[in-house]
């Protein structure tokens, strides 16, 4: 028995870095939103745990999050079953879109089913958090969610995002570690109530309220990557009602209330860079 699934990417509508823990991790407050840009993973029975990928630049050894996820499941469950994972890689990496984390979450879910483990959601959440801060979001949430802690403490906001989203990867990879080492700390400021504000935005359609949503990586990224800053400016010229960097970059997204403007922007951007168009009220599941 084999199984094929889509592993969707995400953007961060807001990303506030709120502190630093003794272990070196940063705490944050973020609003996750899914986008219609996805990898496809096929899982087939095998004697061992092995992996193939359509992108030769992506390692398929023990450093890959999918392999790590499968081996963590083996250890946790005591299962001796194997799997061949075939990854059709479409979501760019080094983009701030969470592609690797989404692939890991898809692996946890798929193998819990295929290996007939029936591990409870609490155990899967623990494994997901060990793999990466974004992995629990992809494992558990269908759409808009508030992330706190290091991003693993999740609240399903239970509202549809009534706007189209155009997301562009400017073919520049940015290291998350570099971004965390160099962003401008401002832990003492007063933050908006992001969960309440995004719910109001979704109910009223008032995109203007989103201007208070910041991404704390933007200033350092725009200072050091002129092509990423130029992409932001291009979105504004295209009529985006809200434009931000996603994660630590380098992907930039624009939010549109007008479907025609969104489609026109998408058609123009995709001539230059890898681009996705996400319809209104999009959900991963």
Swiss-Prot record:
Among its keywords, does the record have Transferase?
yes
The catalytic activity, as recorded, is: 4-CDP-2-C-methyl-D-erythritol + ATP = 4-CDP-2-C-methyl-D-erythritol 2-phosphate + ADP + H(+)
Q: Where is the active site?
A: 10, 134
The cross-references to SUPFAM superfamilies, in alphabetical order and at most eight, read: GHMP Kinase, C-terminal domain, Ribosomal protein S5 domain 2-like
| Coiled-coil regions listed in the entry | none
Q: What does this protein do?
A: Catalyzes the phosphorylation of the position 2 hydroxy group of 4-diphosphocytidyl-2C-methyl-D-erythritol.
Similarity comment text for this entry? Belongs to the GHMP kinase family. IspE subfamily.
Q: Which HAMAP family match?
A: IspE
> What's the protein name?
4-diphosphocytidyl-2-C-methyl-D-erythritol kinase
């Amino acid at each position: 028995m084999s199984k094929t699934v889509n592993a969707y990417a995400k953007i961060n509508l807001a990303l506030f870095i709120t502190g630093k823990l003794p272990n070196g991790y940063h705490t944050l407050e973020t609003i996750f939103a899914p986008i219609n840009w996805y990898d496809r993973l096929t899982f087939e029975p095998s004697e061992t745990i092995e992996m193939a990928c359509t992108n030769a630049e992506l390692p398929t050894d023990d450093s890959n999050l999918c392999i790590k996820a499968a081996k963590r499941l083996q250890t946790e469950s005591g299962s001796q079953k194997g799997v061949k994972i075939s990854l059709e890689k479409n979501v760019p990496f080094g983009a701030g879109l969470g592609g690797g984390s989404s692939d890991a979450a898809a692996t946890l879910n798929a193998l819990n089913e295929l290996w007939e483990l029936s591990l409870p959601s609490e155990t899967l959440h623990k494994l997901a958090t060990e793999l990466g801060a974004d992995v629990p979001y992809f494992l558990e949430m269908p759409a808009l969610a508030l992330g706190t802690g290091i991003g693993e403490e999740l609240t399903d906001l239970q509202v549809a995002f009534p706007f189209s989203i155009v997301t562009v990867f400017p073919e520049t990879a940015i290291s998350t570690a570099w971004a965390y080492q160099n962003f401008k700390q401002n832990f003492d400021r007063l933050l908006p109530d992001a969960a309440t504000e995004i719910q109001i935005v979704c109910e009223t359609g008032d995109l203007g309220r989103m201007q208070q949503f910041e991404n704390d990586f933007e200033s350092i990224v725009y200072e050091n990557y002129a092509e990423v800053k130029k992409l932001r400016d291009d979105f504004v010229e295209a009529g985006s009602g809200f434009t931000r960097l996603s994660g630590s970059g380098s992907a930039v997204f624009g939010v549109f209330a007008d479907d025609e403007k969104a489609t026109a922007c998408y058609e123009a951007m995709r001539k230059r860079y890898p681009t996705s168009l996400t319809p209104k009220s999009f959900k991963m599941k």
